[in-house]
């Protein structure tokens, strides 16, 4: 399975999350996952909430259209983006 896959209603991303980073960014490929650095600490769901907000902004969708399907409590996550309006260049390179 690759880091980014298209599905009927959007994209499925396999992510490796780096919490407490200096800035929010999509870093690149990390093994068979997409590495995302976020500034929030991994405490009380803050990192998950921040990740959803960051991805919603990157793909220009509502936060309700970003679903964490797997990995709620770990660094390895599977996230579904429903009907993305924009695809960031780091992700677009992997979908081709």
UniProtKB/Swiss-Prot annotation:
Signal peptide (residue range)? none
GO cellular component assignments: cytoplasm
Superkingdom of the source? Bacteria
| Gene3D superfamilies (UniProt xref) | YggU-like (3.30.1200.10)
User: Into which family does the record put it?
Assistant: Belongs to the UPF0235 family.
Q: Which PANTHER family match?
A: UPF0235 PROTEIN C15ORF40
* Stated name of the protein: UPF0235 protein KPN78578_33230
UniProt-listed InterPro entries: DUF167, YggU-like_sf
Q: What is the lineage of its organism?
A: Bacteria, Pseudomonadati, Pseudomonadota, Gammaproteobacteria, Enterobacterales
Q: Which NCBIfam families match?
A: DUF167 family protein, PRK05090.1
| Species of provenance | Klebsiella pneumoniae subsp. pneumoniae (strain ATCC 700721 / MGH 78578)
